[in-house]
Amino acid sequence: MTETFIHLDKVRKSYRTRDEDFLAVSDVTLDIDEGELVALVGPSGCGKSTLLKILAGLHGFDSGKVDIGNPANPFIPGRDIGMVFQQPLLLKWRRIIDNVVLPAEILGLPKKETYERARELLQMVGLGGFESKYPYELSGGMQQRAAIARSLVHNPKLVLMDEPFGALDALTREKMNLELLRIWEESKKTIIFVTHGIQEAVFVGSKVVVLSSRPARMVDHFKVDLPYPRNLDMKTHEAFGDYTRRIYKLLGMQ
């Protein structure tokens, strides 16, 4: 039986500006199991990224509880987390492999083993042979693949992805969704994937969490009962349409 890996209980987060206070996240309660690929979907600006930053330990929160890990699989903040952002954020003066090893380098992990793992990860994300290239020599999609490899190099237990394919063209985005699913099935990591794309959420997620407009409240969450490995033909299936219509309805768009 799969154990709960992340538990949020009535998490609340507000911000103070010069003119006013505003609530970004309101009483979110959620359980995520080990090895799930959870898609967080909601309108732009609703607080999805704020929730992700709370999980990453980059933001505090006003009240509630956040537990990550369990007795069988303890979690070390900072060490056991990987992040992928909307932009690849590769250092232009470092080769691709030197960008990939950066988190492990910061953590002081053994250099030889780190570079071996980086080469394996670049192979896994389809960038074998590009180790010595520089970021400007790669397309946007290839740079984002390198960013995914970088997020995995220190073998984190949790990977947080904040609209990682939002800046890509539609065709490259579809390819990257397929790539993400393949990487997830190979790595068995717990992944939280933020998107405002409803079809994208259903396609990549083993579970979908639907958030309201700001402040982010959890409207619903459900398992996506579509088989793996997934392919683009699934978007024509009746069940896929049912899931997307469910989300549209939950967001008041139908």
What are the language-model segments listed below?
Residues 64-77:
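Conserved ABC transporter NBD signature motif
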